[in-house]
Amino acid sequence: KFEAPKFKKKLNLPKASEDPKSDGYLTARQIDSTQFYFAKHFKKFVNSLKPTFDSVKYDEERIIIPLYYKKNLIGLQGRAVNPNPVKYITVMFDENAPKIYGLDNIRGDAPVYVTEGPFDSTFLSNAIAMCGADADIDKWGISDPIWIYDNEPRNREILSRIERTIDSGAKVVIWPSGIDEKDINDMVMSGLDVQSVIKLNTYSGLEAKLKFNTWKRI
């Protein structure tokens, strides 16, 4: 069981909106840069909160995505600003804490959209994002999740995750065939009303299986 820490960790960092590079990156993708932070020296910053990196020799700039639970900072994700094969680095201050973005901003008694990435979740109302594998979200007070995976009908990992979600009886979004964009952020940038598309394409049970079998390309 996870209990919120007694000693609060703080993000003594500028907002991503205050740095031209991180603000430019996020604004170009229509993401609200005031919701995130910016670390000029990511490894050094993380080590100041939790000894994580043995060496800070090749440090780098990253956008900081904070993970909160009951107003406590329980972890963070660093998103690379420059080209980097490791786009995201997740650091948890307690390994039992939920690797979920947005938990403090939702109503658990209403339907909750569950996206693959924190940035995608910011475009939807009452949404969270998984910052790791699909977690058991029931224990975090979410009774009616609607799972939203990337629009990648040839990605075996995504296909197996959708299949597991359907088999569990949960609701899942199956993207219509006319949409080519890979994720919610790309869809928003192309001018789609994503919230409406999601409402019209949420399924469960046998209907979800039928739609899934039509959508997948493997």
Regions found by a protein language model. Give the residues of each.
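TOPRIM metal-binding catalytic domain and adjacent DNA-binding surface shared by DnaG-type primases
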Residues: 1-64, 68-70, 106-107, 199-218
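A sequence-composition feature that detects small, non-aromatic residues
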Residues: 4, 16, 28, 39, ...
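Generic secondary-structure boundary/loop-capping signal
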Residues: 4, 8-10, 28, 73, ...
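Alpha-helix initiation and N-capping motif
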Residues: 19, 23, 73, 181, ...
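Generic short alpha-helical hydrophobic face used as a protein-protein interaction/packing hotspot
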Residues: 30-31, 75, 128, 188
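Phosphate-handling DNA/RNA-contact segment within nucleic-acid enzymes
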Residues: 48-144, 158-159
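TOPRIM fold recognition
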Residues: 86, 108-112, 118-218
